Amino acid sequence: MSKVQDASSKKTKTISKDSKSLRNTKQPHHSLPSSLGEEGMVRSFSKDIETKSLRKRLLTLANKYETSSFLNGDPSWFMHQVIGKRNQETIAFIAACLSYGSRQVFLPRIQYLLDCSRSEPYEWIKTGRYALDIPNDNQCFYRLYTNAMMCDLFHALRKMYEEYGDMENYIRNYANLQKGSKKTDAITAIEAICDHFLKHEAIGIVPKNTNSSCKRVCMFLRWMVRTDSTVDLGLWSDLIDQRSLIIPFDTHVIQQSLQLGLITSKTASMSVARKLTDKLLEIFPNDPLKADFALFGYGVNQK
């Protein structure tokens, strides 16, 4: 064999050996970041499916229960029994204030007040005629509310009507002073209502501030603001954006929301109520309180 052939043979062997070495060398593994990895994508996909499934479930329940039959045995029924925007606003607020405890007990008390007003609750308050029907004493009117407390509530409401005409206009003025805008959000409206009754020393019925969940005030605002509903009136839809409404938050809503995994806290505070509402906004972006009917329906189906 010639020297040239020998050199060529050696070179071929070297290349073959180097190729084998390269094949045996482990190549670096370029994995995706954890947030984009397969596991993360599966979790994200699963969460998306769960959200869609929950939305479908809640929407079905909401459509089933948000009907005119819902009014039967509900305090919202009273605002549908009077004529005129101011009458509806007035009896709705009074009904909301009394809506706690047993419906079999508080519904007749609301009916009593409506009867006293002869279905004209706005004038009954504004003219002070309530004083002829409700004695200013410490006798019980309903549960923790005395006659005197009810008189204080009506007196503060009368002052509001004398100065601003109605509650809607009072909140509009309050929002204008606070934010320089004649349209506002629900939390500002709640603050406005709390501030007025505290200022006029109507204590024990309307919350002093927004530290608590203000469940009954939130329910009243739902009645006044939500549109396209057979239950809610939507009288203030041009004042408050319904997307800013806060869920009326009580023990029943807490239990149902915990079971559905919407919240983790059992505290009936405004902060937890707003966190739940934020979750509901993800499901119902334009109308979070439609979910109030769904949660009610979910509770009924659990019994």
Predicted regions and their residues:
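HhH-family (HhH-GPD) DNA N-glycosylase catalytic core used in base-excision repair
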Residues: K3, K10-K11, K26, P33, ...
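Ser/Thr/Pro-rich low-complexity tandem-repeat tracts
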Residues: S9, I15-S16
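Intrinsic-disorder-associated, low-complexity terminal segments enriched in Asp/Asn/His/Tyr and depleted
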Residues: D18, N24, H29-H30
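Conserved hydrophobic ligand-interaction patch in extracellular adhesion modules
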Residues: G37
